Regions:
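Short, surface-exposed beta-strand/beta-hairpin micro-motifs centered on an aromatic residue
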Residues: 109-115
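Primarily secretory-pathway and cell-envelope proteins
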Residues: 32-89, 93, 130-163
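Short, acidic Ser/Thr/Gly-rich low-complexity loop/linker segments typical of extracellular
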Residues: 98-108
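N-terminal secretory signal peptides that target proteins for export/translocation
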Residues: 1-13
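Beta-strand-rich interaction surfaces with strong enrichment in secreted/lumenal proteins
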Residues: 101-102, 112, 134-138
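Detector for glycine-centered tight turns/loop "hinges" at secondary-structure junctions
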Residues: 24, 34, 98-99
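A short tyrosine-centered beta-strand micro-motif
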Residues: 119-125
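Bacterial N-terminal signal peptides
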Residues: 17-27
Length: 163
């Protein structure tokens, strides 16, 4: 047998097929792992915002990006001694002159981050018809204003029981 001639016996071919199969199986397993993507950045009156946080991976991602956004809103419903995350919240934010900067935007998860300019704002969040209001102050570059809206226990159930 020449130095450059391949052995054509079945054993090396079977071994190569098994190795190839193992590589493909490993690639399939790696591809099956959950990949978390940033929720889409959206616009309201020229203001960028992003909402999400459904599921532990996406919630962790939102907590990771929070420091890069000047305004952070978190939505929850009181549940005894703790609070559960709330989703499907409608948020409206007005600047100090009363102009709407976020116009009835829907938070698809318990977190919403927005690129608001430094200043004072009035924020109104609605869940199941119940409205909470907060005064919000956004600081200068490199700071993040965290604003938590927490509804009373059973708020989400009001809309579920009325249908």
């Amino acid at each position: 047998m020449s130095f450059f001639q391949l052995d054509s016996t079945p054993a090396p071919r079977a071994l190569a097929a098994m190795c190839g199969g193992a590589v493909l199986a490993l690639a399939a397993c790696m591809g099956a792992q959950a990949t978390v993507y940033n929720p889409p950045i959206q616009l309201s009156n020229g203001i960028e915002y992003m909402s999400g946080g459904i599921g532990s991976d996406e919630a962790e991602l939102m907590r990771t990006v929070e420091p890069r956004w000047p305004a952070v809103f978190e939505f929850a419903v009181k549940d005894g001694r703790k609070a559960d995350f709330a989703a499907d919240v409608t948020l409206t934010v007005r600047d100090a002159q009363g102009r709407m900067v976020l116009d009835h935007v829907r938070a698809s998860g318990p977190y919403l981050v927005a690129r608001l300019e430094p200043g004072k704002y009035s924020a109104e969040a609605m869940l199941s018809g119940q409205v909470l209001q907060r005064e919000v102050t956004v600081g200068g570059p490199g700071t993040s204003s965290r604003n938590v809206f927490e509804w009373p226990q059973g708020t989400n159930m009001q809309s579920a029981s009325s249908s």
